[in-house]
């Protein structure tokens, strides 16, 4: 079971849309142009480290590479910004196109970066040079979310038609198609072993799928009463966290038993994103109420 921990009110001046936790660094961004980093360890847990203000519109997605060397931020202004976290300086600016950057994520530790636009274009860039290396031809042109498998072998996208499409990173070939929901899919993630895909949709359901099976549906998790905005799996493979829109809930699930472990309704507005700590013992959530909430495994 988890318990409610620290709360930071007014963490941003506007709603917070995205959060990532890697090493001792938590990063947040949202409706405003600013991206902030925070301490992830005690005794300075959730105290502000650095503010980056390089976008001219809201920040829709961000990621920190596994070695916590780089922070990548994707904005509605059509740019991806890469920051060097050792010097807290701008490393590269990438033009991601006129429709903006919907989701981003690092590949192969910190060598490459994946960007997905609202039109469904999947692009892979060099982190070192900022140059586009290649594109993956995606047939889903109404994408709402994207996930990269932890083994760096697949990129999954999903959107308005309720379908998940999985692509092989190296070849760009589509390797699976999952008819996951009858309504738009808002959130998507892989299990830590890359064998299961979790989807969250506008039907308030979370569904588990085996992308390598001819009958991919495994089970459904029911606990929300509104759109599922975010899904994140813990690195130890035990837990799945989900957040809702109107219901404002943060739910933590036991993956093995498929039972609800903990549920919180602490935010005052819809809860956009979640991030587990690297050791899977803590969770943070961000919301349109401009706050960051933390939750910790009971000792």
UniProtKB/Swiss-Prot annotation:
Keyword Glycoprotein belongs to the record: no
UniProt entry tagged with the keyword Cell division: no
Pfam families: WD40
Entry-linked SUPFAM superfamilies: WD40 repeat-like
SMART domains cross-referenced by the UniProt entry: WD40
Swiss-Prot/TrEMBL WD repeat ranges: 11-48, 54-93, 96-135, 138-177, 180-219, 223-263, 266-299
Superkingdom, taxonomy of origin: Eukaryota
Record-level GO cellular component terms: Cdc73/Paf1 complex
Entry keyword set: Repeat, WD repeat
Intrachain disulfide bonds: none
Family under the similarity heading: Belongs to the SKI8 family.
Protein name, entry field: Superkiller complex protein 8
Species, as recorded: Dictyostelium discoideum
